[in-house]
């Protein structure tokens, strides 16, 4: 996905079309909550912010990337994961 984002951004920039990707971490949705509690605890040890994301936090990044504020942003993958490492 990262390479596709970069390639498409180069091809479509001539047409003033921006292409970006969002790489979310674990988000507190029904899918995220279906992860067994023991696994969730281990996963949280890799998140410096100490919690999983909220759907609205991912949506806010989408809104930013679609707005004029991101008019010079293309070919990027934005990691929205609370600083996840590991």
Question: For each of these PLM feature ranges, what is it?
Answer:
Residues 10, 19, 23-33:
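Short, flexible catalytic-loop segment of classical short-chain dehydrogenase/reductase
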Residues 63, 74-86:
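Short C-terminal tail/terminal secondary-structure segment
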Residues 16, 21, 77-79:
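Conserved beta-strand scaffold in the Rossmann-like NAD(H)/NADP(H)-binding core
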Residues 10-14, 71:
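Alpha-helical segment proximal to the catalytic Tyr-Lys
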Residues 1-11:
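Conserved catalytic helix of short-chain dehydrogenase/reductases
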Residues 47-58, 69:
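A conserved structural motif in NAD(P)-dependent oxidoreductases
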Residues 5, 59-62, 66:
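Short-chain dehydrogenase/reductase
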Residues 33-47:
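A short C-terminal helix-loop "cap" of Rossmann-like NAD(P)-dependent dehydrogenase/epimerase domains
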């Amino acid at each position: 996905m990262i390479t596709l984002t970069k390639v498409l951004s180069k091809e479509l920039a001539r047409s003033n079309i921006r292409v970006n990707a969002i790489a979310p971490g674990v988000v507190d949705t029904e899918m995220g909550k279906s992860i067994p509690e023991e696994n969730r605890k281990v996963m949280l040890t890799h998140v410096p912010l100490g919690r999983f994301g909220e759907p609205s936090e991912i949506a806010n990044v989408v809104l930013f990337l679609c707005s004029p504020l991101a008019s010079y942003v293309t070919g990027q993958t934005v990691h929205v994961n609370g600083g996840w490492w590991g």
